[in-house]
Structures are given as C-alpha cells and as structure tokens.
Regions:
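Extended beta-strand solenoid/passenger and fiber regions
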Residues: 59-114
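Aromatic- and glycine-rich beta-strand/loop motifs that create alpha-glucan
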Residues: 2-42
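Transmembrane helix-loop junction
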Residues: 28, 177, 190, 221-225, ...
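Short hydrophobic, aromatic-rich alpha-helical segments embedded in or entering the lipid bilayer
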Residues: 289-322
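Extracellular/luminal ectodomains and secreted, surface-exposed scaffolds of diverse proteins
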Residues: 99-135
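Alpha-helical transmembrane segments of multi-pass membrane transporters/translocases
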Residues: 14, 309-362
C-alpha cells in the first residue's frame, strides 16, 4: 500500500516549486545571519538618528517658558476684525500647540479674550492682540514640536543606503554563489526549471529586503507620532517609492550576480555601483547641465523629495567668482517611478535568460 502511495505521488509543478525555493532561501538568510544583520544595521541607524539631535541640543519637542514676544507696530499687517492692526508677536517655532499657550503682559497673565493665535500667516506662528500694545512687554509660555516633514526627512535620507545594503546582502551573490561554491552540481540536476529557481530566489531576496525596509519605515512612523505628534502626509508614498527602488536595485544585483564569476566581485560591484559610481555620474550632470533622469540612483531621490511640501523644482546656483554654474536637478515623481520600473523589468528578464543559459564549468 505504501509503495503504491509512493508511486502515486506527483512532483510539484513549476509554479509550486517557486514557494519551496522561496522558503528555503529565506531560511538560508536566517542561518547566515544576513537578515538579522540587516535588521541590526537599520536599528542602530534609527537609534543614532533619533538620539543624536536631542543629545546635541536640538530636541524634537519641548516647552518654552517666558519667551519675549517682539510685537510689531501698527504699520504691520491689517487683520480683519482687530481694532489695532499689526499688533502681533512672532513665535519662532515650527509647530506650536495652541492649547498650551499662555501670554503675559508685563508679567501678568492675559485672558485668552485679549489675544488670538494663528499659524496660517506668511510670518508663521503669531499671537495677535486685540488691544493697543504700546508701552508693554509681552512674554509667552508654550509647548512646541518640529514638523513631521523635517522629522521624516531626517530618517528617510538613510533609506537609500539601506536599500543598497539589502540588495548587496540578499541579491549580489544569489546566483553566482551556486557556481563558485559548486552547489549548482547538486541543485541543477534536480527536476526544477531554472526559471522557478530564479523566481524563488528573487522572491526570497525581495521578502527579506521588504521586511527590513518595512521595519525601518514602521519604526520611523511610530517615532514621528510620538515625537512630533504626527506623520507626514506623503510618508506612505515615500515608502512605496522605497519598495520600488528596492525592486530595481535587487533586479540589477541579480543581473550582476549572473554576469560575475565570483561572489566577492559581485558584492563589491553591486555596492559601489549604487553608492559611488552612479551618484558620481549624477553629480557630473549637475555640473555639465544635463538631467540624469535615466539614472536609477537619481530617480531614488524622489523618496526624500516627496516629503517636501511644496515639491521642489529644478534650480540653478551661480558662482560668478569661480565661473561655475551648478544645476540643482530634482527627479520628477512620475518619471522616477517609470524609470525604476523599467530597470527592474529589463534587469529581471536579462538576468533570468542568462541564468537559464549559464552552465557549470570546472
């Protein structure tokens, strides 16, 4: 009976073999400590970015006490409904908690009916007085915090390098290691197509990378909610661009892995291609006056730029004494998304074809 059941068993189909390879590759990352190492790197960087500014005297939030308000005279702006236009004191903080504001006139607490707070002016955060302020000194006590935009930007700036690290750890040697370590002699003769093997490996690499990037963005979001009481409205869009950049970089890493003959060369080339070589080309464009919209590393800038409101535009900086003109190019979000997707698709197709044709030698 058992022998009949044994003969009745069917081999998994090509599609069913993909998740099997996927699972074993993920287990390999766990055994080799690569996934854990990537998470540790991300955690250390998050800790440093979060701790260093407050430790050096730049906290994310706080409370200012008895801060002198420099009140403008009647020649200032005219506010509808106020009998004394222009009597306004500026609070020089990014975001002020309106409910926490206390205003003092010559050391005496003013009633909230004698002033109003507004953050919707070209001056920023101001206290508008409903009476003549001539001859008086005004101070204010209030809670404040930084903007969610600036907080998120400080963290997302590292996401680019973290993605390259993930591609280096999980993709650079994914293919070439089977040839260098001669494990291909054990794997390739099995009844599994190269395409299934490739897709399983690539899926595992992307899963590991997504776990690391998701952890990075997730912790950043929590810290933002705790530290500045909010999350930038484009934060999730930045996360989406980060995942697309991960897809493009991972695909290129796999292409390099199919072309190289050794794991060391593939790892080094993958890392420096995205950290040094392509960024140098992008910088040359800023000096020469051509916009490297085709560059995947240039397009990656959209991850942090999308957090800026309004979205930045191209500009030119003139240095007349040096006779130098610097073009400050900014990647367009739509173009960047298409460029990264194109790199991913082309690299995956080419690397898969090369992998199917590559044979064991030696």
């Amino acid at each position: 009976m058992s022998e009949q059941q044994h003969h009745a068993r069917k081999l998994p189909t090509d599609v069913e073999q993909i998740p099997i390879v996927w699972r074993y590759e993920l287990l390999k990352y766990l055994r080799s400590k690569r996934l854990i190492g990537s998470v540790i790197i991300a955690a250390v960087v998050i800790a440093l970015i979060f701790v260093v500014p407050p430790a050096t005297g730049n906290p994310y939030s706080g409370k200012d006490k008895a801060v002198t308000l420099f009140v403008t005279g009647p020649q200032g702006m005219s506010i509808s409904g106020l009998p004394y236009p222009g009597n306004a004191g500026l609070i020089n903080r990014s975001v002020v908690v309106a409910s926490s504001i206390e205003v003092f006139q010559d050391g005496t607490l003013l009633s909230s009916t004698d002033w109003t707070f507004s953050s919707a002016t070209f001056l920023g955060n101001i206290v508008l007085f409903t009476h003549n302020t001539t001859g008086h000194t005004y101070t204010a006590t209030y809670k404040w915090h930084g903007t969610s935009e600036s907080f998120a930007s400080g963290f997302v700036g590292f996401a680019n390098l973290l993605i390259v690290i993930c591609a280096t750890f999980f993709g650079a040697d994914a293919i070439v290691s089977e040839y260098q370590a001669r494990t291909g002699y054990l794997i390739f003769p099995n009844p599994i197509k190269r395409a299934s093997l490739y897709l399983g490996k690539f899926g595992a690499s992307m899963t590991a990378g997504i776990l690391v990037i998701s952890m990075f963005y997730g912790v950043t979001a929590i810290l933002s909610l705790v530290s500045v009481s909010g999350l930038d409205k484009d934060f999730l869009l930045s996360f989406a661009f980060a995942l697309e950049y991960l897809l493009a970089v991972m695909a290129i890493a796999y292409l390099i892995s199919t072309l190289m003959k050794g794991t060391t060369g593939a790892t080094v080339l993958t890392f420096f291609l995205f950290v040094m070589i392509l960024p140098i080309v992008d910088s040359i464009g800023s000096i020469s006056g051509f916009k490297a919209s085709w560059s995947v590393t240039f397009s990656a800038g959209v991850m942090s730029n999308i957090l800026t409101s309004p979205y930045p535009t191209d500009s030119i900086s003139e240095f007349s004494r040096a006779g130098l003109t610097i073009h400050n190019y900014v990647p367009d979000p739509t173009t960047s998304a298409l460029v990264m997707l194109a790199y991913a698709v082309v690299a995956i197709v080419i690397s898969m074809v090369l992998f199917r044709r590559k044979e064991m030698t030696g």
